[in-house]
Structures are given as structure tokens and as C-alpha cells.
Amino acid sequence: MTARVVISWKQSRDKLNLSMRILFLLFLSAVAGWSQDLVGLYLMWQSDPSTTMTINWVDLHTSSPLDVHYRRVGEAAWAKATGVKFAIADTTMQGRRVELKGLLPDTHYEFNIGKGIEKPAEGWRFRTMPRDLNRPVRFVTGGDMFSTRLKLDKANSNAASLDPDFALIVGDLAYANGVASNRWVEWLKSWMQAAVSPDGRVIPLVIGIGNHEVKGGYNGKIPDDAPFFYSLFTTPERRAYYALDFGDYLSILVLDTAHTNPIPGAQAEWLAKALAARKNKQFVFVGYHYPAYGTTKGPKGKTPLDAAHSIEIREHWMPSWEKYGVTAVFENDHHNYKRTHRLRQHKRDDTNGILYLGDGAWGVATRTVPEPGTAWWLAKAEGRNHVWEVKIRNNGTSTIRAIDIDGKEFDKVEVLTPRTKPVE
């Protein structure tokens, strides 16, 4: 009887030990295998782009590392920063985020998740922004990105090949409509894999919201009706409209065209104050999704200018940026290429007017544009996938180029003053 009891206990102990070993091996496998299951890695800024970088990564493991190891390229010693977890809508994806602070301006860094690296190819790289405009700064911008994964990869790779300091993408990223998590998985993978510069840098994102981030497209709630946008992306002001400042030389103002914040009211009041506070910034660009001066989608029997949101933008926002002057305005949503004439107070003004550039065709199918001469506000328009490349210089000039998805330049504007003349 005793022997049977001992054997039974021994068998139970062995089974328990085996179960513990299996669980331990599964845990190790999850930790070791998280990098193979990495869904996405993307960079953003929550504060000063010259001394900080926010690293975000998404995977499928609850036990993934929270640590980031980083160092200046060429240095031997690693620094470590520990991030935080965040939920991604109602999905099993696991998000982590860490903001690196105290970085040197205009400096290349290499980093990895969970450990240091032995070879540069094992990790990722980024570059901080310059504190002053002591070299030309270049960014790409557009919107309306994802139709097919193949086309998205091509468009992202094309944008990264221009070697931008960052990408300003304003709306309709994954076309998930606030519910389709599989679309976000593919979008995140594409950005991580394809949006890498020629020297191996991950391109930082400056993000705006569009109708396809929101359940219902417009007049959503915060953050309930845009759960992926608000969980994935953290902005300097923790909302879909905000300003990002680069020293004294550049400000980017990102707005929400009635997707989760109304155009009039609080947002319009904030815009007026933000522009007033930045009257001494050298360059100021404004970006948003739905256009004030579009190329399509007009109400039945009317022009794109007659769309309700277009009218609201011109009534509630345009007076503020005309009052203080801006470098240019970027619009999206209409799935075309467009450059307006210089416009001022809703009229053509080739001397003091503002350029409105768009119209959101990063990687989606394009639409029909008005016949030449039929839309008084348009200088040039066509159905063509593209990104805008912007280069600013310390002498106050900038070059803005339209680059199609095959890498061909097909339009260019030389802007000789940093900001338009303010309306008195």
C-alpha cells in the first residue's frame, strides 16, 4: 500500500513538474518570439522633436518586454528606458510606448526592444530634429492611404525614399472605420517594413484624423467612435487637433474636420489662439482631412465648394490663418492631386494668396477631377497617386514638390517667402 502511495505521489509530482516546465517553455517562447510577431513599430512626438522621441510598438504577447535600449550611433554604452502598456481598442493586440527624453538635436540613434544589439541590422534607427534650421528640413505629407497592401507598401516605400525628416499624414490611414482591426494590422506592418529611409531610419509620424478612422465618419465622440486612432496615436495635446513646434523655425497645426470635434466653437477658438502664439515662427503649415477647396464630392448639382464642411472651414478657420499668414495648407479626402491658385478671402490673389495643396491620394484609387477652367480655384488637378515633399530652408524659402507613386516629380512650387502676408 505504501509503495503504491509513493509511486502515485511520484507520478503526480512528475506530471506537475512536466506541466511547470511546459508552461515555463511556453513563457520563454512567447518572450523570445514576440519580435517575430511584432505587428508594428512607429515613432511619434509628444513634445520637443529635437530632444525626444516616442517609440510605439504593437505585438500579440502579454509578456512582451517594456524596455527600450538606445544609444547614439557609434557609441558603445546603451541607455535603457521603460515604457507603459496601452490597450488597442477592443482587440488582443498589445501596445507599448516609451518616450525617450534628453536626446541630442539632429543626432542619429539606434535602438531595440528588450535588449541591446550587437549589429546595426538587428535594431532600428531614428534621427532627432535640429533645434535650429541649420540645414534644410524635409517632410512628406498626404492622406488616404490604404486600398491594397501591395499598393500601400509601394506608396510608403516611395515616400521614405525621399529621405524625409518626418511624415505628416492627415486622415484615412487604414480605412478601418473604427472597427476593422485587421486593416490596422496590415497598415502597421506596412509602415514598419516599408517606411524606412535610405539610411535605415524609421520615419516619424505626425498624424491627423479622417472620416475612415471614425464609426460613422463625422460627428463622432471622443474617443469612443475612433477607438484605434485614439489608442494608437498620442499627440502633444492628447486630442485630434494640436500644434507641434520645431524650435522657432517650424510649426505644424493639425486639425479635425468634424470627425470627432466640431469645426466651429472650441476648435476654431483654439486655432486662432495657436496662430497668434506662433506669429514669430518662421514657417507654419496647416493640415487637415476634408478640404475647403476640393476637387470632387460636391453636393448634387453643386460644386465641391458648396459642401457643408468646406463652407464651415472657410467661415471658421480660414480667417485665422489669413490673419496671421501661413506657408501653405494641406487638404485630403478627395483622392486626387490638386494645387489651387493662391487664394485670399475666397478670391484668386497671385501675390498674397495661400496655396491649398491636396487632395489625399497616397495609395487609394483616384477620382475624376473638374475639366480645366471649370473650377476657378484650381490651378492644376488630376487623378494621380502622390505625396507632397516639402523642403524648408533658413533663408525663408521652401520648395514643394508633387511626387507620384512611381517616384516621378510632376509638379513643383518654389515659395519665396516663409509665410503669406497677413490680412489687415
Model-derived features: where do they sit?
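Bacterial N-terminal signal peptides that target proteins for export
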Residues: 9-23
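Metal-dependent phosphoester/phosphodiester hydrolase catalytic core
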Residues: 37-370, 377-381, 389-424
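Sec-dependent N-terminal signal peptides
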Residues: 22-31
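Local alpha-helix boundary/kink/capping signal
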Residues: 8-9, 297
